Design a protein with these regions (language model features):
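Basic/hydrophobic alpha-helical interface regions
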Residues: 2-193, 200
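Acidic, serine/threonine-rich intrinsically disordered low-complexity regions
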Residues: 218-238
Length: 238
């Protein structure tokens, strides 16, 4: 495990690349004291430490851009995400939580990289690399497409105005019509809320409901904010 700090380190291409990654991560996270480490179990966030995978031998190749994207997306999470609020909003149901997590990460990245083309390119490379490793990018049947990833890509299109990255369009198109038919209106409603994590997360529960997933708020699929005529009056506190 190698920590990158203010100490002098060798100027090999790998070390220069690590220092550049650490500097960029601190800037995006808006945390100048963020600890950045490199280890085989990265990427992960733990408290005030960001652990990234060990860089490839060639710091100029596609693997290096994907690693920059991993660093960027996690740094933006530190700057644009409230973990406490997320814990209160996140569904307990595993399938619903997967979709919730994917869409919240999409929000984080869209908000954080709105004017940063290079950061968006890096995160696109990381996304394509991850879905290729999962085997999802090569899917030829709708049932092989991870719902969470597909919903995240549909939200990404709405928040950024950009199509799915090259290599992922065919995957998302396999399920696009079905997901749009079921939850298109609810997905559209997310667009205006991207800068407000709480409002976005609350609206995201409507997306989950439209997809027949349990949002964890005790409301049924057809629930509305209007209590209706048969709703009992609230009891006075003791």
């Amino acid at each position: 495990l190698l920590y990158v700090s203010g100490m002098a380190v060798s100027d090999t291409p790998a070390e220069v690349f690590k220092r550049a990654l650490a500097h960029a991560a601190r800037a995006l996270a808006e945390q100048p004291d963020l600890e950045v480490a490199f280890a085989s179990d990265g990427p992960k966030l733990s408290g005030h430490q960001l652990t990234l995978p060990t860089p490839p031998r060639d710091p100029s190749g596609p693997e290096a851009q994907a690693l920059r994207g991993q660093a960027d997306r996690m740094a933006l999470r530190l700057a644009n995400h409230d973990e406490g609020l997320n814990a209160r909003l996140r569904p307990a149901d595993a399938s619903a939580a997967e979709v919730f997590d994917a869409v919240e990460q999409t929000r984080i990245e869209a908000v954080g990289s709105a004017s940063l083309t290079g950061v968006r390119d890096n995160m696109n490379a990381a996304l394509v690399s991850r879905l290729h490793r999962m085997g999802a990018a090569a899917a030829t049947e709708a049932q092989r497409v991870p719902v969470a990833e597909a919903v995240g890509l549909l939200v990404r299109e709405r928040l950024t105005g950009e199509p799915a990255p090259d290599g992922l369009k065919a995957m998302v198109d396999l399920v696009r019509e079905d997901l749009e038919d079921r939850a298109g209106d609810q997905l559209d409603a997310l667009t205006a809320l991207a800068s407000d994590q709480g409002a976005f997360g609350a609206a995201l529960k409507d997306v989950l409901r439209a997809l027949d997933l349990d949002p964890g708020d005790g409301r049924g699929e057809d629930a509305s904010d209007d209590p209706g005529e048969e709703e009992p009056d609230p009891q006075e506190p003791d």
